[in-house]
Amino acid sequence: MSAFDPQAHSPPRCGPQFPSIGQEPPEMNIYCDSIFHPQTMPSPQRPSNFETADYSTTANPYLWLNGPSITPPPYLPGSNTSHFMPQSYGMQRQLLPNMHGLGGSDLGWLPIPSQEELMKLVRPPYSYSALIAMAIHGAPDKRLTLSQIYQYVADNFPFYNKSKAGWQNSIRHNLSLNDCFKKVPRDEDDPGKGNYWTLDPNCEKMFDNGNFRRKRKRKSDVSPNGQISSDKPEGSPLNESPKNGEHHDMLGNSSPGTDDSSEKRSPPPSITPCLNNFLSSMTAYVNSANPVSRSVPLGLTNEPSDRMGQNMVGLNSYTPLSNMPSHGGSDWSSTISSSPFGYSSSVFNQFTPHFYNTINANNTLYNREGTEV
């Protein structure tokens, strides 16, 4: 039997049925405009009876979005639609392309009709000190009274029109407690009441240009006469004074036995005391005169240092064998002095796990040529 009736073999459908013209439901037609349907879907061009060969020549059994070749049949509202389907579905297809860009009239349903109403609900991202600084900068004379500052904030930021008592108290507290705002008395010939408030020139760097974002106040900007007093150590050349000179002389007299070469090796005075202490400790570590008397590097426990001291005693009491032809006393002395810490490489071979991070690998961890017994 080459042909069959699909109506006889199909089970009964539940719910409302759409017209048998090969159309999908209107919801699918609205939101999936370019769905690639497989070839087996019934269409208006197909007859009611199909051959079995038509089912075997399926191009693609899947649904593909944005199909290039096959598009669904257009939705045709009319008398063929079911009785339960409202007639307004036929107009949704023409309204969807126009919804990509909404104009001002399309937002009429929003509870916020204008931008001013939105600004009343959003708190400005500025501190009270920044608001005062903005008001003073905007004044022609760079000074304003308290009432003028209130008026500036209320006019430019509608958020503060709701409760004036709260933010006005904060404005007064910032004017009295912040050192950046200076009170200027009113002139005798100037009528009115209340003093003027101006911005300290040393505090202008607390705000970025135009942004008025709060920055940490630096002591170098606040100190008078441009002198840097508290951020610099006593030995810095920018802060020379007679007291510092006397202190330097006292340090020089307290150590009369120091060599001139050690003074040349001392690093120049640095800007920060932490860097000065670090450089001085590193210089003393590298340029020490007696390598044997150096302290053990950091990161070693007490146990390896004690063992090292015992090995040092055994090494100092050891005398080289004179009957060996390839190694003499001078060779052993050169071997001991070749190590950066004054120890031979054979001693350091016992402590290699503890010296990986502190000892030069070229001189200590590997034996040099001619040093093995």
Swiss-Prot record:
The keyword DNA-binding applies. Residues 1-23, 208-274 are annotated as: Disordered. Signal peptide: none annotated. One of its GO terms (molecular function) is DNA-binding transcription factor activity. It holds the Pfam family Forkhead. Keywords: Activator, Developmental protein, DNA-binding, Nucleus, Transcription, Transcription regulation. InterPro entries: Fork_head_dom, FOX_domain-containing, TF_fork_head_CS_1, TF_fork_head_CS_2, WH-like_DNA-bd_sf, WH_DNA-bd_sf. Residues 123-217 bind DNA. It is found in: Nucleus. GO terms for biological process: negative regulation of endodermal cell fate specification; negative regulation of mesodermal cell fate determination; positive regulation of DNA-templated transcription. Its main location: nucleus. Transmembrane segments: none annotated. One of its GO terms (cellular component) is nucleus. The keyword Transcription regulation applies. Transcriptional activator. Activates ectoderm, in addition to inhibiting mesoderm and endoderm formation; required at the blastula stage for normal formation of both the central nervous system and epidermis, the two early derivatives of the ectoderm. In addition, also required to maintain the regional identity of the animal cells of the blastula, the cells that are precursors of ectodermal structures. Also plays a role in differential adhesion, which limits cell mixing as primary germ layers become specified. This is Forkhead box protein I1-ema.
